[in-house]
Design a protein with these regions (language model features):
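N-terminal leader/signal peptides at the extreme start of proteins
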Residues: 1-18
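Short, flexible active-site loop motifs that bind/organize anionic cofactors or intermediates
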Residues: 9, 42, 76
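Aliphatic-rich helix starts adjacent to a transmembrane/signal segment
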Residues: 20-21, 27, 36-67
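Hydrophobic transmembrane alpha-helices
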Residues: 35-36, 76
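Hydrophobic residues within membrane-embedded alpha helices
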Residues: 13-16, 24, 53, 149
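Short, conserved structural patches
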Residues: 2-6, 49, 54, 58-161
Length: 161
């Protein structure tokens, strides 16, 4: 018994397919590379932001314990030295994570109001860390309007004294 043909010619030649695969690869490979590099970039940005948050939290915790050194002292040199120690603590934490910031990028506010119902006048230590991060893969800057991203870490701890 002979099979019935459906009228569509069948060829087993792959000569025409080789060129199509090369064209598809030329289109898909750059898009895949951009997607992969973007994922690495985004992951590192997220890590850097988390490290900034942790550094701000460490500074706020340290500052909350040192509030009475500043508020209880009338000597401006003691107040300035205590603020410098708080900022140095944050900078040292970031240096341990291979992030370089200046002490001027750390903002300390030890009179930050915290709203707690039934407890008026509660103050906290608010630490802000500003950091400008450049991109890992500079070739992506054509896709992103700015070659640097501004990141910020914030933390508030209630003052203990």
């Amino acid at each position: 018994m002979k099979p019935v043909s459906d009228g569509i010619p069948r060829t087993t030649s792959l000569k025409g397919q080789r060129g199509a695969v090369a064209v598809e690869m030329a289109i898909v490979l750059p898009l895949f590379a951009i997607l992969l590099l973007g994922a690495f970039e985004f992951g590192d940005i997220a890590r850097t932001h988390q490290v900034l948050q942790n550094a701000a939290r460490e500074g706020a915790r340290f500052s909350a314990n040192k509030t009475n050194w500043i508020a209880g002292s009338t000597d401006p040199t003691v107040q300035a030295a205590t603020l410098a120690r708080i900022k140095d603590r944050v900078v040292a934490y970031l240096q341990g994570e291979k992030i370089t910031v200046n002490a001027s990028d750390v903002i300390v506010d030890q009179n930050y109001p915290i709203a707690i119902p039934g407890l008026p006048g509660v103050k906290g230590s608010h630490i802000t860390v500003n950091y400008q991060r450049s991109l890992i893969f500079p070739g992506i800057t054509g896709l992103i309007p700015s070659a640097a991203i501004n990141l910020q870490g914030n933390a508030v701890f209630r003052n203990f004294y």
